[in-house]
Structure formats: C-alpha cells, structure tokens
Amino acid sequence: MFLTIKRAVCIRATLIFFSAAYVAATVPAASQESDAVVVKMTAERMFVPEKVSIKVGQTVEWANDDTTMTHEVTTDPNIASDPSDVSIPEGAQPFDSHLIPSGKTFRHQFTVPGLYRYACPPHENDGMLGGVTVAK
C-alpha cells in the first residue's frame, strides 16, 4: 500500500509540473495575440466597434463573426465602391484584406499615425464603414 501511495504522489507531482510548464510556455504567445484590438464584422453588416483608437505599432484584427457572408476591409480608394468613404494619412500605404470567409480574421499593424477610414466594399452601400485613429 505504501508503494501505491508513493506512486500516486509521484504521478500527481509529475502532472502538476508538466501542467505548469505547459501554461508557462503558452502564456507569451497568448499575450502577443491579445495585443491586437479586435473589430468584429457582423451579420448586421457592421464593424463593432465602428471606431477604435490605438498607438503606432499596434495591430487591429478584424474578425468575421458573420456565419452567412464574407466581408472585406479596405482603405484603398481603387477598391472601395465610393472612394470618398476611405482615407489614409499621408505617408501610409492603403491595405486590403480581400474577402474574409466566415470565422476567419485579417490583421494589420499600423505604423503611421493619423486617421484611417475603411470600408467593406460588398456592404459599403449598406453603411459598413469604420475608422482607426492611430496616435504617436
């Protein structure tokens, strides 16, 4: 019986050790992912939240939570239905996600401060517009 208790204690200690090691190994990766500001794209054809504020170097992640439609994020006036719906600050390059399937995401890191106005071209006429303000 003593050997059985000793074995149980050893197994429990081993499980605790490996559980702690697993958590320690995965926390930095989770922290890096959580640095992104998340904007959801909904079935109501909205960006939620519609406007976000971040600092230079931060990332915005657009997540398509809509189970029925693809969505897109663009600041490119050549892609937007109405070029006046999108804008970027001087020195920035336009970006476009292409169509984002349901359950997928698109990430963009902002390196130039200013106001970025973006649209979802397939639903732009429905008012699916948003903005990112990037501070120094």
Predicted features by range, described:
Residues 2-15:
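Bacterial N-terminal signal peptides that target proteins for export
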Residues 2, 27-136:
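Extracytoplasmic copper-binding redox domains, predominantly the cupredoxin/blue-copper superfamily
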Residues 12-24:
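Bacterial N-terminal signal peptides
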Residues 6, 21-22, 114:
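Prokaryotic Sec-type signal peptides and long signal-anchor helices
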Residues 7, 19, 83-84:
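Generic low-complexity, intrinsically disordered sequence content enriched
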